A protein has these predicted regions:
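Non-catalytic signal-transmission and effector/linker regions of two-component phosphorelay proteins
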Residues: 1-14, 74, 113-126
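Charged docking surfaces used in two-component/phosphorelay signaling
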Residues: 24-32
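Acidic, metal-coordinating helix/loop segments flanking the phosphotransfer/catalytic sites
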Residues: 39-57
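Acidic catalytic/metal-coordinating carboxylates
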Residues: 42, 68-71
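Short amphipathic alpha-helix used as the core "switch/output" element in two-component signaling
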Residues: 48, 70-81
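Active-site residues of response regulator receiver
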Residues: 61
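The feature encodes the CheY-like receiver
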Residues: 65
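Hydrophobic/aromatic residues positioned on beta-strands within the core alpha/beta folds
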Residues: 88-89
Length: 126
């Protein structure tokens, strides 16, 4: 394989949130940063995305509609997925176990630069 044939794969980020406007805001800005972005509006959609695509970072709401986003995080950990998980939360209080399990916490509402700083740290371009 020549150097011209070799292409670096950009990190893929899966945004799991039931808020369509938040997903859009994140997707557009992450794509501008050069990331591949997938979206899921439910835990079931996220499970489907994980089965079909290689995900390098999860951006996961604590409450995804009626679903428990933290249960998805624990399921990913149990399957030894390996990709970092960043938790979005509008809750002022998270228990210490949740904080310890997540690779990053982004409180809602957040500034875009807060999110991008966490993403750049956990899913750097290769």
């Amino acid at each position: 394989m020549s150097g011209a044939d070799f292409q670096l794969r950009q990190p893929t980020i899966l945004i799991v949130d039931d808020d369509a406007s938040l997903r859009l805001l994140c997707r557009v800005n992450l794509e501008l940063e050069g990331y591949n972005v997938l979206e899921a509006r439910s835990v079931a959609d996220a499970e489907d995305a994980v089965a079909g695509d290689e995900v390098d970072l999860f951006l996961l709401d604590v409450h995804v509609g009626a679903d428990d986003g933290l249960a998805l995080m624990r399921s990913l950990r149990a399957r030894d997925h390996g990709a970092p998980v960043v938790v979005f939360t509008g809750s002022a209080v998270l228990d210490s176990a949740t904080i310890a399990e997540a690779d990053g916490i982004v409180p809602k509402p957040f500034r875009l630069e807060q999110l991008l700083d966490v993403v750049r740290r956990l899913a750097p371009h290769r």
